[in-house]
Amino acid sequence: MSRLEIDKVSVNYGGRGGAQTLALSQVNLTMERGDFVVALGASGCGKTTLLSCIAGFMQPSEGEIRLDGKPVLGPGAERGVVFQKHALMPWLNVADNVALGLRLRGVNRAERLRIAHEKLAQVGLEKVASKPVYQLSGGMQQRVGIARALANDPEVMLMDEPLGALDALTRESIQALILRLWAREQKIVFFITHSVEEALFLATRLIVMTPSPGRIAHSYDLPFARRYIECGDARAVKSDPEFIRYREEIVDLIHATP
């Protein structure tokens, strides 16, 4: 079973004149297969820094991150990343964008295109596989980014505000898509957002982080993602009195967190 461990992780950024900025301080977090963990907090609380450490884009100043007992020392195919900006290659068509990671790993063309078409079908884009990515809407481009991350069959999906630039209706549609994919794949998901409602809807566990330095101030185990999978009605889930109570509590908590 996949297991991601964040063990006493701190990150210092160096500044001019040798000044140090403590971005993360003594963060401890364990995630296992099927966990959907959402990090929420004010700007500057270290959410993206933490995701970058998990992805292997940077190393902690202190502490260690382990996946299945092995230290994370750099990027790897077992960790897929979806960014706020889709980061697609404009000179490649949709299918070749999805297959890019497989190509870099040496997978033959027939097999990587088979996988690309399979993942595009999962995100509802099988009919646009041959189109240039610049012809797609923002929401469709982000779905291509999700399909590309899934193509390598990672153990962990890292999602850094992937829906932040989308309109409200598209955002809700892709929230539901992400949950359906999570329910089917049962991967570890670590997701960053500034939206309290989005965090409550997606998370099986929600962590609220303090700003400067970033620490985990509160953690909530939540039922709403699984409720959506059971009923398929996002509006019913989000209008439930329990959902609204959590939303108000967490908004108050974020405003009160120093």
Swiss-Prot record:
Residues 4-236 form the ABC transporter domain. InterPro entries: AAA+_ATPase (IPR003593), ABC_transporter-like_ATP-bd (IPR003439), ABC_transporter-like_CS (IPR017871), ABC_transporter_ATP-bind (IPR050166), P-loop_NTPase (IPR027417). One of its GO terms (cellular component) is plasma membrane. It is an enzyme of class 7 (translocase). GO terms for molecular function: ABC-type taurine transporter transporter activity; ATP binding; ATP hydrolysis activity. SUPFAM superfamilies: P-loop containing nucleoside triphosphate hydrolases. Its main location: membrane. It is a peripheral membrane protein. Keywords: ATP-binding, Cell inner membrane, Cell membrane, Membrane, Nucleotide-binding, Translocase, Transport. It catalyses: taurine(out) + ATP + H2O = taurine(in) + ADP + phosphate + H(+). It is found in: Cell inner membrane. It comes from the Bacteria. Its EC number is 7.6.2.7. ATP binds at G41, A42, S43, G44, C45, G46, K47, T48. The complex is composed of two ATP-binding proteins (TauB), two transmembrane proteins (TauC) and a solute-binding protein (TauA). Part of the ABC transporter complex TauABC involved in taurine import. Responsible for energy coupling to the transport system. Belongs to the ABC transporter superfamily. Taurine importer (TC 3.A.1.17.1) family. This is Taurine import ATP-binding protein TauB. It comes from Cupriavidus pinatubonensis (strain JMP 134 / LMG 1197) (Cupriavidus necator (strain JMP 134)). The lineage of its organism: Bacteria, Pseudomonadati, Pseudomonadota, Betaproteobacteria, Burkholderiales.
